[in-house]
Design a protein with these regions (language model features):
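Interhelical loop and adjacent transmembrane-helix boundary motif
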Residues: 1-7, 164-203, 207-208
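Transmembrane alpha-helix signature in integral membrane proteins
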Residues: 5-34, 94
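Transmembrane alpha-helices
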Residues: 21, 102-105, 109, 113, ...
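Cytoplasmic-entry segments and transmembrane alpha-helices of multi-pass inner-membrane transporters
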Residues: 33-64, 117, 141
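Membrane-helix interface segments
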Residues: 37-45, 73, 85, 115, ...
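C-terminal transmembrane helix and the adjacent membrane-cytosol boundary/short C-terminal tail
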Residues: 41, 106-125, 133, 192-221
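Membrane-interfacial helix termini and adjacent extracytoplasmic/periplasmic loops
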Residues: 61-94, 164-168
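Membrane-cytosol interface at the C-terminal ends of specific transmembrane alpha-helices
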Residues: 82-121, 134, 146-147, 207
Length: 221
């Protein structure tokens, strides 16, 4: 593996870990609200969350580039320029992977039901206690699935990160873009090495999710 590829690998892991952490922090309250609310316009929020699933990555990346660019709304408000930077990659990755984190969490909170929370309320548990000691433990499979899917999806990003970050070695060049560069230069050996590594890693992560969820169902029974 070339030093540039190793740098891209480290950058990709850093991006995936940070994006997944941020997604879990902001996605948990959103998923909890979506699972509990009776607001009749909830479907609009759910549609916004799911939008990255159907939008072409280049479309999402284009509008994020405008938002984060030198003449974008963020810069005009004094937020600076985040395009073609690692911070911009994190911002774009969080938006692009949001449905892969929020939807499993929402499903897990809904599957837990209201009954355990009502029982905890009769024992005088505060809303915070009910959330952290009842809802979150019951939704553990959803958290595992959300974390793994968010992480794996971020690792495999191409269109969005290319649009927002370009292809700057050591700064915004992630593994998927490095693979593309190797294919363009007909360096199939390096492309095989990186692609195979991502393939194996993705399979291991998904297998771990299914194994963990199966174990949780067995323990629940």
């Amino acid at each position: 593996m070339l030093s540039a590829d190793l740098t891209a690998f480290v950058l990709t892991l850093k991006l995936a870990l940070l994006s997944t952490f941020i997604l879990l922090i902001i996605g948990t309250p959103i998923a909890w609200w979506l699972a509990r609310t009776n607001w009749r316009l909830r479907f609009l929020v759910e549609a916004m969350v799911a939008l990255p699933l159907v939008l072409p990555p280049t479309v999402l990346g284009f509008y994020l580039l405008i938002l984060l660019g030198a003449n974008g709304p963020l810069a005009l408000l004094g937020g600076g320029t985040l395009a073609f930077s690692f911070t911009g990659l994190v911002f774009g990755s969080v938006i692009y992977s949001m449905p892969f984190v929020i939807q499993p969490l929402q499903d897990a909170f809904q599957a837990a039901g209201k009954r355990p929370l009502e029982v905890a309320a009769t024992l005088r548990a505060s809303p915070w206690d009910r959330f952290f000691t009842v809802a979150i433990p019951l939704a553990r499979p959803g958290f595992i699935t959300a974390a793994v899917l968010g992480f794996a999806h971020t690792i495999g990003e191409f269109g969005v990160v290319l649009m927002i970050g370009g292809n700057i070695p050591g700064q915004t060049q992630v593994l998927s873009i490095a693979i593309y560069d190797h294919v363009e230069s007909l360096d199939y050996t390096s492309a095989h090495l990186l692609s195979g590594g991502l393939l194996v890693l993705s399979f291991i992560l998904l297998a771990a999710v299914y194994a963990s969820n199966k174990r949780f169902r067995v323990l629940k029974l």
